[in-house]
Amino acid sequence: MARYLGPKLKLSRREGTDLFLKSGVRAIDTKCKLEQAPGQHGARKPRLSDYGVQLREKQKVRRIYGVLERQFRNYYKEATRLKGNTGENLLSLLEGRLDNVVYRMGFGATRAESRQMVSHKAIMVNGRVVNIASYQVSPNDVVSVREKSKKQSRIKAALELAEQREKPTWLEVDAVKMEGVFKRIPERADLSADINEHLIVELYSK
């Protein structure tokens, strides 16, 4: 499945919630009708079956983290092999992706921009360049912006935006040095309550 390159607001309207695909910190529901699906018949919201609800939740989470279907299924399989709650394990794996950590630290305005920074070799982990967006960051890893990339205006703009967002407690960031420490794997209480991972587990358990 190819990566979606169309309008970002359309995806948020499809899922009925802000997927944080745009760089602004203001909720996008002020500029588009999130409760109304895109398209000519978007106002007619059909009642979803249990399967439909589960599928929509999976699509929502997959789009939030910018992960393709096959990748997402592989994350789920890995989550089932780990000890503990499968749904929480899934979210932990997604949060540990390098592109997501770069976004959470504020070096990229969106996850898509952060993914591009990683692929363009602008990010280092423990002093070594890593250009794989799905690289799993471990506790105590140091993630930093490469020296020659620090002058990029988009990084400075992203850091300014990040100042307006709630700071993740599982990260320690030095905005001046443009580096941060992944102190620990986030707990479920640290993450968005708008995600219902249990629906995803139910979907894949069938």
Swiss-Prot record:
Keyword vocabulary terms for this entry: Ribonucleoprotein, Ribosomal protein, RNA-binding, rRNA-binding
Natural source organism: Photorhabdus laumondii subsp. laumondii (strain DSM 15139 / CIP 105565 / TT01)
Matching SUPFAM superfamilies: Alpha-L RNA-binding motif (SSF55174)
Pfam families: Ribosomal_S4, S4
NCBIfam families in UniProt: PRK05327.1, rpsD_bact
Disulfide bonds: none
One GO term (biological process): ribosomal small subunit biogenesis
GO molecular function: rRNA binding; structural constituent of ribosome
Entry function: One of the primary rRNA binding proteins, it binds directly to 16S rRNA where it nucleates assembly of the body of the 30S subunit. With S5 and S12 plays an important role in translational accuracy.
A cellular-component GO term for this protein: small ribosomal subunit
UniProt keyword rRNA-binding, yes or no: yes
Domain annotation S4 RNA-binding: ranges: 96-156
Subunit description: Part of the 30S ribosomal subunit. Contacts protein S5. The interaction surface between S4 and S5 is involved in control of translational fidelity.
Family: Belongs to the universal ribosomal protein uS4 family.
Name of this protein: Small ribosomal subunit protein uS4
Xref: PANTHER family: 30S 40S RIBOSOMAL PROTEIN, SMALL RIBOSOMAL SUBUNIT PROTEIN US4M
